[in-house]
Amino acid sequence: MSANKNIWIIRLGVAFVCVAIGAAQANEKDGSAVTSGNWSLLGGGNEQHYFSALKDVNKSNVKNLGLSWFTDMEAGDGLVGNPLVADGVIYQGGPPGKIYANDLKTGKNLWTYTPEVQYDKDTSWTGFWGTHVNRGLAVDDDNVYIGSYCKLLAVSRTTHKLTWSSQSCDPKKMQAITGAPRVGGGKVFIGNASGDFGGDRGHLDAFDAKTGKHLWRFYTMPGDPSKPFENDLLAKASKTWGTDYWKYTKGGVSPWDAITYDEASDTLYFGTDGPSPWSPAQRAPDAGDELFSHSIIAVDASTGAYKWHFQTVQNDGSNMSATMHIMLADLPVEGVSKRVVMTAPKNGYFYVLDASTGKFISADHYVPVNWTKGLDPKTGRPIPSNEANYWERPGEMTIPLPGDVGGHNWEAMAYNPELRTVYIPSTLVPVTVVASKDTGELDLDYYYGMRPDATIKTQGDLVAWDPLLQKEKWRAKRSLPVNGGVLATAGGLVFQGTGDGHFEAFDANTGEKLWSFHVGGSILAAPTTVEVDGDQYLIVASGNGGASGMRGIPRLMNNLQSQGPARLLAFRLGGKTELPITSTPDFPKPQYPKPTSAMAESGRHIFNANACGACHGFNAEGSTPGLPDLRRSDKLDLAVMKSIVIDGAFKPLGMPGHPHISDADLQALQAFILQKAWTAYDTQQTLKTSDTGAQ
């Protein structure tokens, strides 16, 4: 059901009148249409359009694009942030808050800042996990800003030393910083992540950019109702969480990525995650909307005072976060140019909201959805459907769409104001969910859609979307569901990296693929483009990493051909540099016999219950080069495993100990890993035999 009919009938009548308005908007405010040698703000400007007015590289000559240089980076957990460029230097962030500064023209590393991370003995799982995820950094005239182990760091661009460090969350309370900070108005803004465990309340902080002084905090959910609320807003929000809600949930609703600053109105827009635990059956029975979960929130950037919110999903059970990329633009609404917010959260809908009031303007879905029957055309509120409500059917398999991975995750969209088109890296991952009849524990299969018998197939697309008509213009299918962020240019091109390791260019009008280059590693980062000395450079970071890998589903975002090292790559017309050939080593024959199926299945439950798969992959296949493929491990001796898994021997490396795991549980874990190791080895040997026989 489309939720845009009422206003678009009016809008179509004024479409021709609005053409002139659109042309005048081609050079957007706040530097979104980048023409210089700098790309110092995330997405190229405060509006975060990921659009450049550069057009030296265009549809007629993009076939001549070649690699100018590449640099292999010491980043075991991959690079996924949008590279920023200021004064001839590329700044790239990586885990655990590392800053790389490289020369724009040569790729030579100029300096690297590595933060000191000393894990507290009480560091939570999320605190450890978060140090393996970094989605970028921020830059201003003085400093580079990055998150690390719940701290916001400012590092001088001149001295390359720490200017200040400020605490923003508590790694002992299931919190971490994984998103890129944003800068504006002399301030630095940062949110936090909970890893979906909800150990503490989500909040967004503002710091003075020069001194690191904490200026304000906005809590995204109410706290313990037995204590005074921080303000009347949270007191009112508490009424939406149900009776005795603090008995069921003590956190979540994290603003872990999307933050957008509007200089003209001094407004900060950010998105929030969902409540914890995931299942509504495990939260207050009479819970309502649970504000401000899954919301777009606008606050005064100077004070943190609330302006408005728009909630995309109420009382959610499928982790359909609204923390995805938020853009600002000027669009013709009923014949008048209006400042709008555009966003495509996980729930599968693309929204256009009034930036001043938060009022719903329009929305429609860009991937299949079954969690709602549609949206109210006036308010945008979802019309209830129980098709995705697994918590109402314990013991039965349910496939919520688009589900936990989302129709669009954190990877950046792009907006071409000249064509008035948004380009969405969309995802469809049908995840089967079965809630235990006894405990309510969720059993999820993220790889269901890759099975031959799947009724709904896993799919990734690059979607060109008309935000006025809420209509698809074209769709380019990708080989894997999780792919990189997008860049649009005035050269009539759209650039995107892919999970299978390709960097590609498309015709912005038709979706025709015009150019492709295999970089050897998975790409989640959005590209950057700048011009220097008459050459237009396209810059992109590669290397397995990011939330998708860290959520234990690496097969959705890479394959055997895209597991190369983390790299920074620059392309220009006439580039002639060649990449070295990389290969994946064979699986070694496991050193222990095959386990029984029953023991391995017991180990699978222990593996999942302790969130081992979130770092090491649900099939123990490893998420990033920095988190080992356990199927290849030479540390499966039970005594060695005990020292690592139970006693925490690798705690300094970010691997927590699990003292609650028994010796019997450890044996079951060993059996599960061995089963996966033998499966990988046997499959490899079968393929080798088949290849030999075919010759």
Curated annotation (Swiss-Prot):
Stated family: Belongs to the bacterial PQQ dehydrogenase family.
GO molecular function: alcohol dehydrogenase (cytochrome c) activity; electron transfer activity; heme binding; metal ion binding
Name of the protein described by the UniProt record: Lupanine 17-hydroxylase [cytochrome c]
The EC number(s) this enzyme carries: 1.17.2.2
Chief location category: periplasm
Protein encoded by which gene: luh
Signal peptide (from-to): 1-26
Subunit structure: Monomer.
Annotated localization: Periplasm
Record bears the keyword Heme: yes
Domain Cytochrome c positions: 598-677
Entry keyword set: Heme, Iron, Metal-binding, Oxidoreductase, Periplasm, PQQ, Signal
Function (record text): Catalyzes the first reaction in the catabolism of the alkaloid lupanine. It dehydrogenates lupanine, which can then be hydrated to produce 17-hydroxylupanine.
